[in-house]
Amino acid sequence: MGKWVGNTPKYLYLFSENGVDVIIPVGLLSILKKYFNLAKYNYSINLSDDKKFKFNTNVELYDYQKIAVDSCVKKGYGILIAPTGSGKTQMGIALICNLGYKALWITHTTDLLNQSYDRASQYVDKKYLGKITGGKKQIGSGITFATIQTLANLDLLDLKNEFNAVIVDECHRLAGTPTKLKQFSKVVNSLAARHKYGLTATLHRSDGLEKTTMAYLGSVCFSIEENDVKDKIISATVFKINTGIKIDTCCLDIDGTINYNNLINYLAANEDRNKLILRYLLKDKQEYNLILSQRIEHLISVYNLLPDELKEKAVLLNSKMSKNSREQAILKMQAGEKNYMFATYSLAKEGLDIKRLNRLHLILPTKDKAVVQQSVGRIRRCDESDKKAIVYDYVDDFIKSQKDFKTRKSFYKNINCEVFD
């Protein structure tokens, strides 16, 4: 298409060479074994499985969770797919305890690391838990929690045989940008653990790199369906909000095709559109609203439209916030002190566990299945109230926007949402 791709490599290599050795992801083990057996090659598997650990705990599971965990234990490695709100972290902890091996739990954000650590501490004494983050390395005798960024900067030779089990949380992110892929490749291929698992709500990627994730961790060992958890999460209703905004010539290239960046900038800056969004925010000022956009500038514009008394009831998450400020903002939302949370899709994609949320505003278009379904999942978590989950999907008056909504509509249907359009 003649577009600049920056430093993006043409090919992504999943193997590396070290002298006469070829290092291949463990997820390909079953395929290699089949070919070796057919060719009658002699081979040995040198993976780490000598660090047994007795957790002496019982992680309570629903029937569907127990079936999933048992299947993963039997398979030995692979990917567990479970919808948002189904208890992925709970199942991951139970999986480690059932395996009975010293384990490493990998996340891509500190927030997610802390949430997973806190959940594990409900079942496993903290003296058996450790963290590798922020340059500090504390290895736990039971489970160690680490961010992928910190691990990638360590000398992993010291950790090669340290763990017999590895859990990669939100593993669909493993095959993200080339930089992220290099990080995950370095870390996952450097660990000799026999048991490697991935946890995710959806293996789908908009770039089609699902097979890359499976190459590192193995195929899907179990998939929990929406119907399996329908009694554990609340249903959501989706309302299509027609903005009436038509496409402008500033959004088009010379040849008449849509310039996506210009389109997003135009929609984000459109005063009439933002005032329509404000109207729905004011209507639900007593509810707990999650407002998502692709641009922080757009979120700021809508936030600034709120009356001063409602700005006091709003939090705006951004990547420049300190860890403490972000944690405090989330805690205030969890406690019901705030009614509005503004965030980009990327910031809200994973690790945002606020059961009180019951309204979702998708104020700029996206058709990424993982993003849409995870965003909806944020408002479907059960709490002690009799809450109703509502999604507002803002759709503009031009063909691309309507087509994108049609795509999202199919995603909503897949997770049993009722859609009014």
Regions found by a protein language model. Name each.
Residues G2, Y11-E17, K33-I81:
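Conserved pre-motif I regulatory segment
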Residues D255-Q294, I300-L305:
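Conserved interdomain hinge at the start of the Helicase C-terminal
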Residues N114, Y128-I139, L290, I300-S301, ...:
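Conserved helicase ATPase core of P-loop NTP-dependent helicases/translocases
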Residues F342-A343, L352-P365, I390-D393:
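A short beta-strand element within the Helicase C-terminal
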Residues K74-L99, L104:
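Walker A/P-loop
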Residues A82, L203, K367-V391:
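Conserved SF2 helicase motif VI
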Residues G134-A165, G176-T177, L181-S185, L347:
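Conserved helix/coil segment N-terminal to the catalytic DExD/H
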Residues N164, H172-K240, Y412:
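Post-DEXD/H (motif II) to motif III coupling segment of the RecA-like Helicase ATP-binding lobe
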